[in-house]
From Swiss-Prot:
The keyword Cell cycle does not apply. The lineage of its organism: Eukaryota, Amoebozoa, Evosea, Eumycetozoa, Dictyostelia. This is Asparagine--tRNA ligase, cytoplasmic. It comes from Dictyostelium discoideum (Social amoeba). Its main location: cytoplasm. It holds the Pfam family tRNA-synt_2. The gene is asnS1. GO terms for molecular function: asparagine-tRNA ligase activity; ATP binding; nucleic acid binding. PANTHER family: ASPARAGINE--TRNA LIGASE, CYTOPLASMIC (PTHR22594:SF16), ASPARTYL/LYSYL-TRNA SYNTHETASE (PTHR22594). GO terms for biological process: asparaginyl-tRNA aminoacylation. One of its GO terms (cellular component) is phagocytic vesicle.
Length: 653
């Protein structure tokens, strides 16, 4: 099918022209969406609502589920129609490897019809229950306080329809919405009751009580029982705001932790409290108290406020920027907002601690840190994965690896390491590939192949132990199942891995879709490698790969010159997180390797000189920090541990 025909197909299911064209730029997504359209039997076109759900399925994390076609079919048959049903369907894909129609129908609300009468009754019941609150707050009542209970009682209803009927009920109950009553002068035609409300709203200005003790300025991490019954001042963001009539519960966040705060009395007067929106920055002054034993608060304390002021306003439209119904692409378009969430911010803190733990490990073991260049004129791993840039009229590249530079530092510093960005023009669209990643690399002189494996093993275990000691609650809040891996790690030769795959039905897929056994010399792709790793269920050093499969600089095995002293460290759930090898130390052997790889020896003179002036047996490795975190935190996708991911399809924000 031509590109023009593909575009017509995508337009026929309701995609707008821009989204259709953007999809066509991604060959993998194009093929996937076409398959899903065929599975849904809507190749001749369909309603836009169906097409949007099919597109969301093509871009969701569970798209490669073996039972996905059943969801495609259900969408095409309009059994899955609402966003909440679609979310349930993708959760079903995540939780199940085999499909059962009855279980699926129950789980996703297939066939459940919520009538307008049922929606209206639920809204009427809610208004009866919240009559006093609605009467007092009127249009200032947070819409979430009404919508969230309705989401629970009307689980399978169309949320848009619920919102429309809820708005009508509010207008019937309260009259037309007065939008500017607090900030602008009331027009001459405004009714007297509205004028009275405005006068009340403008009547209060908060001031600190000068008779109270001067507050101590604290970061949230410092707020602990140590300062119980003391007056403190905290500057933070409003992480959550829960308004309950005459009292407001506020969860504060300043990057160092979370703190619960309680506001009451004049502090929650309608003239000021409506400005306290989620993500607003505030100054809160009050007394730290230890809550009752049955009340859990972060840090073991609660802030009873006696004064607050707005430092930086937020906006009510934040709730529409991202929410539970946002698809993955939209969430990562709004990554700068998404990272403020509890889980995402916890991952960013762990990422920071992880870098500290790696450096701590290296310095404790007498490694020195190196800061190599990332603009280079040679390559290390392979020319096809290079990003080329114009360097004053000459071609230059973004570095794939700093290994060659680290090797030149061996006679200068001995054991050395770097934590530097690396770049790979990866075309793979998988859950573990990035085009820019944080690359931890180390080079070590005077070691053996076995000692190299021991050092990598020690690094991984030691860093896990350090991280867990630093903040076990933080680690377990993200991955409750985390356990430090035990040494020694399993060692498996590449040849044994091929045999394992044969014996356990792990096969390679040919271009025509047929599956056959792996043979010696085959590269084991990510999916099959991960399947083997997950079956074994523990860390594995995959060792001694054939020379033809590895980079030019890797040393040959003395017992079999067709093999290399190479290794990949595989971790369950992720696969490879470390790649390493012993390096060629002989001058003549390295020159021969250049020629075999088609490299210009003159461009590598500075690297070759390491074998000319005092060579020695040495080895090193590279660890992908994001892959390490993905494994450690048991994340579904590597993008979740990136600050801002860079992949084949994403360069913003």
């Amino acid at each position: 099918m031509s590109t023009e025909e593909d575009q017509k197909l995508f337009l026929s299911i309701g995609l707008d022209e821009k989204r259709a064209k953007d999809t066509l730029k991604n060959k993998d997504l194009t093929a996937l969406l076409k398959t899903i359209i065929e599975e849904a039997s809507v190749s001749k076109g369909c309603d836009k609502s169906i097409g949007n759900l099919l597109y969301s399925l093509a871009t969701c994390q569970q798209v490669n589920s073996p039972i996905r076609s059943n969801v495609s079919k259900a969408i095409g048959e309009e059994k899955i129609k609402t966003t909440i049903q679609f979310q349930a369907a993708t959760q079903y894909l995540k939780d199940n490897k085999e499909f059962n129609q009855d279980t699926f129908n129950d789980f996703c609300g297939v066939g459940v019809v919520i009538t307008p009468e049922q929606i209206q009754k639920a809204i009427d019941d809610l208004f009866t229950k919240k009559a006093t609150e609605i009467s007092e707050k009127k249009w200032h009542i947070p819409i979430g306080d009404l919508l969230n209970p309705l989401k629970e009682s009307l689980k399978w209803a169309d949320l848009k329809e619920v919102k429309i009927m809820l708005d009508k009920k509010l207008e019937t109950t309260l009259g037309p919405k007065v939008v500017e009553a607090k900030e602008k002068k009331v027009a001459a035609t405004t009714t007297a009751p509205v004028k009275k409300i405005e006068e009340q709203l403008a009547a209060i200005t908060l001031k600190q009580d000068a008779s109270l003790p001067t507050p101590k300025r604290l970061k949230i991490r410092e707020c602990s029982p140590k300062f119980a019954n003391q007056r403190v001042e905290v500057h933070a963001w409003a992480h959550h705001v829960r308004n309950q009539k005459k009292i407001v519960f506020l969860e504060l966040r300043d990057g160092t932790g979370f703190l619960q705060c309680v506001l009451s009395g004049d502090l929650v007067h309608p003239s000021i409290i409506d400005k306290l929106l989620r993500e607003a920055t505030v100054k809160i002054v009050g007394t730290l108290v230890i809550p009752p034993a049955d009340k859990k608060c972060p840090g073991g304390v609660e802030l009873q406020a006696d004064y607050w002021e707005l430092l930086g306003p937020s906006n009510a439209d934040l709730e529409g920027v991202i929410n539970q119904e946002s698809n993955v692409d939209h969430l990562f378009d709004q990554r700068h907002i998404m990272m403020r969430g509890t889980r995402a911010s916890s991952i960013m803190k762990i990422r920071s601690l992880c870098l500290f733990a790696f450096r701590q490990h290296f310095f404790e073991n007498h490694y020195m840190e190196v800061t190599p260049p990332t603009l280079v004129n040679t390559y290390c791993e392979g020319g096809s994965e290079l990003f080329t840039v114009d360097y004053f009229g000459k071609p230059a590249y973004l570095t794939q690896s700093s290994q060659l530079y680290l090797e030149t530092m061996l006679p200068v510093l001995g054991d050395n390491f770097t934590i530097t960005q690396s770049y790979r023009a990866e075309k793979a669209r998988t859950r573990r590939h990035l085009t820019e990643f944080l690359h931890l690399e180390a080079e070590c002189p005077f070691i053996t192949y076995e000692e190299l494996q021991d050092r990598i093993e020690f690094l991984v275990v030691d860093v896990c132990e350090k991280l867990f000691k630093m903040d076990p609650e933080l680690i377990l809040s993200v991955n409750p199942d985390f356990k430090v891996p035990k040494r020694p790690f399993m060692r498996m030769n590449y040849s044994d891995a091929i045999e394992y795959c044969k014996k356990n039905g792990i096969q390679k897929k040919l271009e025509d879709g047929t599956e056959v056994d792996f043979e010696f010399g085959d590269d084991i792709p990510e999916a099959q490698e991960r399947r083997m790793n997950d079956q074994i269920g523990e860390p594995i050093f995959l060792c001694r790969f054939p020379a033809e499969m590895k980079a030019f600089y890797m040393a040959r095995c003395p017992e079999d010159r067709t093999l290399t002293e190479s290794l990949d460290l595989l971790m369950p759930g992720v696969g490879e997180i470390v790649g390493g090898s012993m390096r060629i130390s002989d001058f003549n052997e390295l020159v021969a390797a250049y020629k075999k790889a088609g490299l210009d020896t003159d461009e590598y003179y500075w690297f070759t000189d390491q074998r000319k002036y005092g060579t020695t047996q040495h080895g090193g490795y590279g660890l992908g920090v994001e892959r390490f975190l993905t494994w450690m935190l048991k994340e579904e996708h590597i993008r979740n541990v990136c600050v801002y991911q860079r992949t084949k399809d994403r360069i913003t924000p």
